[in-house]
Design a protein with these regions (language model features):
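N-terminal "arm"/small-domain region of PLP-dependent enzymes with the aminotransferase-like
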Residues: 15-71
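PLP-dependent aminotransferase-like
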Residues: 111-169
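N-terminal secretory signal peptides and thylakoid transit peptides that target proteins
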Residues: 1-16
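Active-site pre-lysine segment of PLP-dependent enzymes
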Residues: 153-162, 178-198, 202-215
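Short hydrophobic alpha-helical segments of the AMP-binding
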Residues: 84, 133, 192
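Phosphate-binding glycine-rich loop
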Residues: 79-118
Length: 215
């Protein structure tokens, strides 16, 4: 107990020494409050949420679907896949829907871990889905972002090992918001050995002026 009190005294003295102006940096960020009404409060950037809520058309569609919500939506899912394929100019067989992108990321991780090995990921980036990787037999190779907080694609190429199964790229990157140019990313993918999965997460691509790699 005495050690804890001594530690608290030292910390308190250190904070006082910083001055009143700098004490503001110790206040709790508003984004820690998950129950805030985003209509009246700042946008919660950390959660990839729509601050405006569902559009009027979406609300009508949801209301109309309540009476059939006790049934599996096979038909609706097929229609959604067809529309996604049409928008991205790809075959519908290349579309997989899931309960959020994390489920799909998990599936790719499971597939990559089938033969064990390693995977390459930037630091920092969105890595919540990678936590089970070691239990699945995949070792993590972290590549720091460059001085501009962008992906160091050359360093990622150099980090490839003989047992590398997967390379993950979040574009635009979460949490830095930086983006890899389309041509640079295409060239990078072409340089990666064909036996390695390059997983490009474009969760935020619609917030940029850059065209998605899907079309």
């Amino acid at each position: 107990m005495s050690n804890r009190r001594n530690w608290l005294k030292k910390v308190s003295l250190g904070i006082v020494g910083l001055g009143v102006g700098q004490l503001e940096t110790f206040s709790n960020p508003i984004t820690d409050n998950y129950d805030l009404n985003t209509v009246d409060f700042p946008i919660l950037l950390r959660s990839n949420e729509n601050p405006y809520g569902p559009s009027p058309l979406a609300r009508v569609a949801m209301a109309e679907s309540v009476n059939i919500s006790n049934r599996y939506g096979w038909k609706t899912t097929s229609e959604l896949i067809s529309e996604i394929a049409k928008r991205n100019i790809v075959n519908s067989n290349n579309i997989l829907t899931a309960a959020g992108s994390t489920e799909i990321l998990d599936l790719v991780l499971l597939f990559a871990a089938h033969e064990k090995g390693s995977f390459i990921i930037a630091n920092p980036t969105y890595d919540y889905w990678t936590y089970p990787s070691e239990k699945l037999g995949l070792s993590r190779i972290s590549v720091p972002l460059d001085a501009n907080k962008k992906y160091d694609l050359s360093a990622m190429l150099n980090a490839i090992k003989s047992d590398t199964r997967l390379i993950y790229i979040c574009n635009p990157n979460n949490p830095t918001g930086t983006i890899c140019k389309r041509d640079e990313l295409v060239n990078f993918i072409n340089e990666v050995p064909k036996n390695i999965i390059v997983l490009v997460d474009e969760a935020y691509i619609d917030f940029t002026r850059q065209q998605s790699l899907t079309n």
